[in-house]
Amino acid sequence: MKKINFAFIILFLFSLPLIIFYQPWVNALPPMPRHANPEQLEKTVRYLTQTVHPRSADNIDNLNRSAEYIKEVFVSSGARITSQDVPITGGPYKNIVADYGPADGPLIIIGAHYDSASSYENDELTYTPGADDNASGVAGLLELARLLHQQVPKTGVQLVAYASEEPPFFRSDEMGSAVHAASLERPVKLMIALEMIGYYDSAPGSQDYPYPAMSWLYPDRGDFIAVVGRMQDINAVRQVKATLLSSRYLSVYSMNALWFIPGIDFSDHLNYWQHDIPAVMITDTAFYRNKQYHLPGDTADRLNYQKMAQVVDGVINLLYNSK
């Protein structure tokens, strides 16, 4: 009996961190009708990647044209609009903020950065179209705006398009999300970063991970969406995972990770953690799947707009049902 009890204790102690990290048992919210429009998502991605390309820090005119496009969609959705200055030399750089629902009380924030990266290849400066990174996230944000116009949320919702996430601003006070997070006066229930939600690959071996052992828990095919948060964001990750699972045909995996796991803080949600705000990232896992990350091959034709629409449907389900 003692040996059995000891074995059970060892199994429990081994399994508990695994369950917390992986969260295998999350019940989906009831399914909802499909709302998001894949054609509109593609239209937004193509505008951002073709008409106003490149959207890098050294192309301020294109960034401002992108901001105006985003602002126009927010205005047409009936939101209360704020343009927030991001104090960077050579600007203006602006976050575009859209508020829906009650003007006071707790907020849910959904954010996505609209800038794109540049890089050097063979000592030559090149610009990525940034379809997945992060026109896909912005397209999701604007589709949420259109859907919030159709049904006003019962809780305060703030959609934020950030001007500066990519290098040289990443992990600095000049990130658009750092400026926004520091400016908040209302309590925040949850922040969600939409960071690369458009690239999917069902080929075996198409999904990589920071550590090889993670392939024991997660698929080797990159055909799922991921929800990522800190260990202390367990409830937030479960909430977002449950709402994404309400999109019936979307595979969803989650991770509550310790700080040293590479990639868990590679987007705008990291700045809300600095203010003790529950924040998660919805992502296709970026360069662990999309080999055109920050490269000229990150183009609109490589994205799956049906799956993007399913992600948006999951998020709007959360917003429609929040009180």
Predicted regions and their residues:
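Extracytoplasmic/secreted proteins, especially bacterial periplasmic and envelope-associated proteins
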Residues: 40-43, 47, 61, 65-76, ...
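N-terminal capping segment at the start of a domain
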Residues: 18-65, 77, 288-298
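Solvent-exposed loop/turn segments at secondary-structure junctions
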Residues: 87-89, 102-104, 114-118, 164-168, ...
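Acidic/histidine-rich catalytic neighborhood of metal-dependent amide-processing enzymes
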Residues: 128-232, 261-264
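Second-shell loop/turn segments in exported
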Residues: 29-36, 51-61, 82-87, 123-134, ...
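A non-catalytic alpha/beta surface segment that caps or lines the substrate-entry region
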Residues: 47-103, 253-255
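Hydrophobic membrane-insertion alpha-helices, especially the h-region
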Residues: 5-21
